[in-house]
């Protein structure tokens, strides 16, 4: 997959551009599938699960799904880094991750976490071994190194 063939990707997007619907917020993406305005969507699993709970006739497709990277950090020079790290450890604990999943529909990052979720949320769990093997590989180093050129190419395509 890497290095990305950006011209080829943008050429493919150009071939279907008239059929694309762009969204700017997670709420808007969820509304698009709830109101049956789109046949397929890329959106966060928690938003998709909420839409299905609200009656949207959608199901997840896990073939080369794209995980989203997130970070939690303690800034250099923080007044109380020990407390900050303690908060992060608490947040990432199995019990707290289970509660977070139950409240938000987003999968836990702690593999020891065992949230109590219904069948709809289980469909959208991104942390199962089967889902992990089917994901699209994200090379954060590549994205960091090529960030400016990738953003420029995509922005120019959007504007054109």
Model-based region annotation:
Residues 75-135:
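Mature extracytoplasmic/periplasmic domains
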Residues 1-61:
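Ligand-binding pocket segment of bilobal, Venus flytrap-like solute-binding proteins
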Residues 16-20, 24, 37, 52, ...:
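Sec/Tat-exported extracytoplasmic proteins
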């Amino acid at each position: 997959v890497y290095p990305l063939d950006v011209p080829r990707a943008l050429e493919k997007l150009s071939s279907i551009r008239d059929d694309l619907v762009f969204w700017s917020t997670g709420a808007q993406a969820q509304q698009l599938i709830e109101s049956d305005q789109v046949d397929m969507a890329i959106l966060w699993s928690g938003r998709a699960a909420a839409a299905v709970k609200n009656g949207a006739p959608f199901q997840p497709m896990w073939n080369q799904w794209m995980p989203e990277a997130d970070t939690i950090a303690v800034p250099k020079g923080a007044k109380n880094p020990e407390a900050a790290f303690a908060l992060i450890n608490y947040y990432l604990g199995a019990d707290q991750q289970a509660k977070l999943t139950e409240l938000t529909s987003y999968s836990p990052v702690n593999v020891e976490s065992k949230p109590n979720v219904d069948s709809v949320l289980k469909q959208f769990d991104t942390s199962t071994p089967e889902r992990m093997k089917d994901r699209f590989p994200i090379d954060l180093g590549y994205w960091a190194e090529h960030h400016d050129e990738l953003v420029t190419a995509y922005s120019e395509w959007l504007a054109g």
